[in-house]
Amino acid sequence: MTKVDQFASVFRAASKTPFHYDPVQIGSVLVVTDQPEVEAGDFADRVRSFLSVLERGENIRWNTVHGGQFSTVPELLELIERDRPGLICTFRHLHSDSWQWPYTLGEYVDVLTQATSTPVLVLPHPKRPSERAITDTDMVVGMTDHMVGDDALVNWAARFTADEGRLVLANVEDVRAFERFMEVVGKIPSISTDDARVQIEGRLLRDAKDYMGSCVRALAKAGLPLTVEEIVTQGHHLSEYRRIVDEHDADLLVMNTKDDDQLAMHGLAYPLAVEVRSIPLLLL
């Protein structure tokens, strides 16, 4: 490595990506159900109670779609386009009995998460026996495999954290992807594999910790009434994500679902959304 290359590496290593706090504004919420009008209204009331934190300093317009207003995906998308909500709230398996088999989110939710740019809050199906009460957002987990620079995820997770609640920011590096990368590095004679492993792993985790530190400082400076906990780790994505959700007794999991390069749900988001069924999910 030349001296110029060394200088460039040192300069890049010293450069840190800061978090920029940008308060999430939600002008309207659309609650979508497949229930009759009266039951739909009751469900909407429960959702509004669960999301009471959103009423903080805002005058939000709440609308409800009941089961008699749509019977196809295009009809539902038309209703959403007409309403133009800032947030969609619904549950798994609309107009379907497949909620009894936990292998999908149902075609309506699948399409909503990809065909609209609006964040979707997915709640457990009303007929599914509840493993826990869904009453508030005192404990929110915002989780990804690459937290650095993901201001939107942090801002949305912070917006949904109740006053005096806890926000857990979790960065889980995929250990299998890392090992595949190191396997390739090990085949390059000019690179010390052991040194590369230590340096790369350390850099990945340090960058995430630095970014989260800037999140803590920015949210505190903004005066948000919440406590932030940082988790930076490696592991097998699905099992590690579930462990963090369970250990923290999360009320809400916030994660990214959209990928510019594909039509399907982003990365691990779909299997995780299918697996984590007992708590609401905010899918960005």
Regions found by a protein language model. Give the residues of each.
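Charged docking surfaces used in two-component/phosphorelay signaling
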Residues: V65-E75, V232-L238
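A short acidic, glycine-rich active-site loop
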Residues: S192-D210
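A structural motif corresponding to the C-terminal end of an alpha-helix
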Residues: T116, M212-E229
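Gly/Ser-rich helix-loop-strand patches that form or flank binding pockets
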Residues: L77-R132, R242-L284
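Generic hydrophobic alpha-helical segments
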Residues: T72-L76, L153, A157, Y241
